[in-house]
A protein has these predicted regions:
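Short acidic, glycine/serine/threonine-rich loops at helix termini
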Residues: 7-10, 123-125
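Short secondary-structure junctions
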Residues: 11-16, 40
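Conserved hydrophobic core element of enzyme catalytic domains
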Residues: 25-142
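Short acidic, Gly/Ser-rich segments with clustered Asp/Glu that frequently serve as metal-coordination loops
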Residues: 1-8, 21-25
Length: 142
């Protein structure tokens, strides 16, 4: 994300103010980083969203090649899952969220996709267990 923000921010203004802070929730834990920057002249919050989308925590890295691999391997569209919900205020303020843990309904069917990132040292059984942990909170909510 730091690299993505550099495309829309003033030179040398992008800062990582929090790196991989652990946030605990009922069924999952997330590593959360905070990255800030000052908009470059002529850039807007929409430029930031465009350069940052899709989120690297969803695609993997390097982002462009990871997206090519996802397109080659995934046989169905993700729909809202792993997309983004955002707002941009009239004052230029912006906030966004990647749609994971999201239930959608269409045609009388409800769904909530879950998954995990696969990396070189992934353990398949542990990835499956993590996926079930992610699903558990959604299942209980339904």
């Amino acid at each position: 994300l730091r690299n993505d923000l550099s495309k829309s921010c003033a030179p040398h203004s992008v800062r990582v103010t929090k790196l991989c802070g652990l946030e605990r929730y009922a069924y999952v834990q997330h590593l959360v980083s905070v990255i800030t920057g000052r908009l470059a002249t002529g850039k807007s919050a929409l430029d930031v969203l465009e350069s940052a989308f899709p989120g690297g925590s969803i695609t993997g890295a390097p982002k462009v090649r990871a997206m090519q691999i996802i397109a080659e391997l995934e046989q169905t569209a993700r729909g809202a899952y792993c997309g983004s919900l955002a707002y941009v205020g009239f004052d230029g303020a912006c906030d966004s969220s990647i749609l994971i843990r999201t239930i959608t309904a269409a045609g009388g069917h409800w769904q909530f996709p879950v998954g995990g990132g696969i990396v070189a040292d992934s353990v398949p059984a542990a990835e499956l267990e993590e996926t079930w942990h992610k699903a558990e909170g959604m299942l209980r909510a339904m």
